[in-house]
């Protein structure tokens, strides 16, 4: 016989970003609890609103499964003393299992007898096991916790209710300072406390109190309501997924509505309006069917449609205050002078250990010129890079960016154009922040890409130089994101600049404001970002092999990893890799540089391998390079079958090692083949 279990925790309003991850955690913890306690079940369904986290288990067994376990103990010679009595070791072993020496039997394992005991445990009733089910709530982890009242414990938010039902039976349990029952809270304004009749009636009972417990249902309600407004008003609404996920976790009973604002604010840059609505007010942006921004917005109320006109007016009033600020800053910032703002950056700290933003820009200016040369930019582009690097942080001191920091770079571009800067310069000011996430948009222009690289390189090297190196998951200065951006930009723009050479040359630059340090750590950090870019779907041994190659060009490293993944499916992969790996391992025994002397060859296999290596011409086509290297496998194996490399003749040995080393030197431009797994 099976039953349904419901566990609901009622809390003060949770931060929106915590709700969905916590709901997911709760489901995972419940599954683990049931599996660990040998309670079978059919399905687990989770629920969440800003004021509750809940999980329902359907088809829960009424009793644990019985358990029979065999335990292996000490060997017989240790378990018995000289008189044939059970030793203290044997007695201690069975006592630890809750058994006695009468339960001991001996079993032979690989020719030797060992103590074995078999423990039988009859399954407990589900009611008894569920006495500790609140463990799943204790085990939930949150970004931050809080204390309340005079309690010694802490949790994400104060807890008000706990409901634990097995079908319609309320279980008597405690969690923190709350005793369980069947009382749950309805909507804060429209509902009231309500009894949950049974685990199966959970959603319906709460719906009567204006609470939609299922997040997916709430989300669909919002989407349907927005679509209905779209159809009625002949408009188009941007349903941003992140915003939708946030909004659904701000409401328990959603009602979408259309608001408006004065058309005069459309003279303010669109980005300001969108940021005000979307980021600050959690409103959905409204456009006409051609994509033109309209003086409207859609918001979602936490409640029903009653007195919705008052809610609309209130939301419009709040938004207008934001738009007034935007309009004011837009007009006032245009009175500022870029040169004056750049000069003031001398007083703005980049980091207390590193210096000012002005000094950061000075270093970026030098780095960007070096990179522009390496990337073979035109003279016109180089001039644009130089100008952009000289001013690109000025907008940080504008009123608009101070109020809306999400618009840094975006407003810089607009103000630069108004001040008469070249479009390439203005675009670079915006693009130097790109990408802003692991899969964010990249710069579109070469000038912007070079400035982005220079800014990110100086940021990386500066923080590493003063010892501010990320550890574990801690990365307060977003250096991983900056480095990922470097790798992505180099690959996307096809700038095949070897990273080891590039970083070494950057470390060779001299600045009065800062001396770069920790080059080795920087290179390791960059390699880790390249590995991240290669992706976890590529086997770990392949990732390691290409990162340990002598190739430091991002695009070639990525291509080599894909080529190896493709080749690993071939029947000859194992044989080819093993032959090259053997050469790699022997080449490590080279103690000093020796030129291959063909006059010392004793057999045709040495000559054949020597000629094959001389004829081996590798290019920047990693797939072709692998084909050529794998084609050598029969020649390499023939060499090993007929040649003693580690001969007693020292001169002969060093010559053969040098021969293999010449092969490895070429092969290592693709991968360190000895790191590949062929088992």
Swiss-Prot record:
Ribonucleoprotein listed as a keyword: no
SUPFAM superfamilies, per the entry: HD-domain/PDEase-like (SSF109604)
Assigned EC number: 6.1.1.14
Molecular function terms from GO: arginine-tRNA ligase activity; ATP binding; glycine-tRNA ligase activity
Keywords: Aminoacyl-tRNA synthetase, ATP-binding, Cytoplasm, Ligase, Nucleotide-binding, Protein biosynthesis
Gene Ontology annotations for the cellular component aspect, listed alphabetically: cytosol
GO-annotated biological processes: arginyl-tRNA aminoacylation; glycyl-tRNA aminoacylation
PROSITE patterns according to UniProt: AA_TRNA_LIGASE_II_GLYAB
Location(s) in or outside the cell: Cytoplasm
Catalysed reactions listed for this entry: tRNA(Gly) + glycine + ATP = glycyl-tRNA(Gly) + AMP + diphosphate
Cited Pfam families: DALR_1, tRNA_synt_2f
PANTHER family according to UniProt: GLYCINE--TRNA LIGASE, CHLOROPLASTIC_MITOCHONDRIAL 2, GLYCYL-TRNA SYNTHETASE
NCBIfam families in alphabetical order: glyS (TIGR00211)
Assembly notes: Tetramer of two alpha and two beta subunits.
Family: Belongs to the class-II aminoacyl-tRNA synthetase family.
Name of the protein in question: Glycine--tRNA ligase beta subunit
Upper classification of the organism: Bacteria, Bacillati, Bacillota, Bacilli, Lactobacillales
The gene coding this protein: glyS
């Amino acid at each position: 016989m099976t039953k349904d279990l419901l566990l609901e925790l009622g809390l003060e309003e949770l931060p929106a970003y915590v709700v969905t991850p916590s709901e997911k955690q709760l489901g995972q913890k419940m599954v683990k609890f049931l599996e660990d306690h040998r309670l079978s079940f059919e399905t687990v369904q989770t629920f969440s609103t800003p004021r509750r986290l809940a999980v329902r288990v359907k088809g829960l067994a009424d009793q644990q499964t019985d358990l029979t376990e065999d335990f292996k103990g000490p060997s017989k010679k240790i378990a018995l003393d000289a008189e044939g009595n059970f030793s203290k070791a044997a007695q201690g072993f069975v006592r630890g299992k809750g058994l006695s020496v009468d339960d001991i039997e001996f079993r032979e394992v690989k020719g030797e007898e060992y103590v074995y005991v078999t423990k039988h445990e009859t399954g407990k009733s589900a009611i008894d096991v569920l006495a500790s089910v609140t463990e799943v709530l204790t085990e939930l982890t949150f970004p931050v916790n809080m204390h309340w009242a005079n309690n010694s414990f802490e949790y994400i938010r104060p807890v008000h209710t706990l409901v634990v039902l097995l079908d319609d039976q309320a279980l008597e349990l405690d969690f923190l300072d709350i005793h369980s029952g069947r009382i749950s809270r309805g909507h804060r304004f429209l509902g009231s406390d309500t009894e949950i009749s049974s685990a199966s009636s959970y959603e319906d009972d709460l719906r009567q109190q204006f609470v939609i417990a299922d997040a997916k249902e709430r989300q669909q309600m919002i989407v349907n309501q927005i679509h209905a407004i779209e159809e009625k008003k002949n408009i188009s609404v941007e349903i941003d997924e992140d915003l939708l996920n946030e909004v659904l976790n701000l409401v328990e009973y959603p009602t979408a509505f259309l608001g408006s604002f004065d058309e005069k604010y459309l003279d303010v840059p669109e980005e300001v309006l969108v940021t005000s609505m979307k980021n600050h007010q959690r409103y959905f942006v409204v456009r006409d069917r051609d994509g033109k921004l309209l003086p409207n917005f859609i918001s979602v109320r936490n409640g029903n449609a009653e007195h919705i006109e008052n809610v609309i007016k209130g939301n419009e009033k709040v938004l207008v205050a934001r738009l007034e600020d935007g309009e004011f800053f837009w007009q006032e910032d245009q009175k500022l002078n870029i040169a004056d703002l750049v000069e003031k950056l001398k007083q703005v700290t980049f980091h207390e250990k590193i210096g000012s933003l002005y000094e950061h820009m000075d270093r970026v200016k030098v780095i960007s010129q070096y990179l522009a040369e390496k990337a073979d930019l035109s003279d016109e582009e180089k001039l644009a890079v130089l100008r952009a690097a000289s001013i690109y942080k000025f907008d940080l001191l504008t009123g608009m960016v101070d109020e809306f920091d999400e618009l840094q770079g975006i407003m810089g571009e607009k103000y630069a154009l108004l001040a008469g800067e070249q479009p390439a310069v203005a675009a670079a000011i915006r693009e130097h922040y790109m990408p802003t996430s692991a899969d964010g948009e990249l710069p579109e222009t070469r000038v912007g890409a070079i400035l982005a690289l220079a800014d990110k390189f100086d940021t990386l090297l500066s923080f590493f130089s003063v010892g501010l190196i990320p550890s574990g998951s801690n990365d307060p200065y977003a250096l991983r994101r900056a480095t990922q951006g470097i790798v992505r930009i180099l690959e996307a723009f096809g700038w095949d600049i070897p990273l080891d050479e590039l970083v070494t040359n950057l470390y060779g630059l001299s600045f009065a404001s800062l001396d770069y340090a920790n080059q080795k750590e920087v290179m390791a950090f960059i390699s880790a970002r390249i590995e991240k870019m290669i992706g976890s779907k590529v086997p770990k041994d392949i990732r390691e092999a290409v990162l340990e190659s002598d190739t430091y060009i991002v695009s070639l490293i990525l291509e080599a990893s894909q080529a190896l993944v493709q080749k690993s499916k071939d029947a000859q992969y194992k044989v080819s890799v093993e032959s090259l790996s053997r050469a790699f391992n022997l080449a490590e025994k080279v103690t000093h540089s020796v030129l291959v002397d063909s006059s010392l060859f004793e057999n045709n296999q040495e000559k054949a391998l020597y000629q094959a290596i001389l004829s081996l011409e590798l290019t920047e086509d990693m797939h072709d390079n692998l084909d050529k290297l794998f084609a050598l496998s029969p020649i390499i194996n023939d060499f090993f079958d007929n040649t003693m490399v580690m001969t007693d003749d020292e001169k002969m040995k060093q010559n053969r090692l040098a021969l293999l080393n010449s092969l490895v030197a070429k092969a290592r431009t693709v991968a360190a083949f000895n790191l590949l797994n062929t088992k």
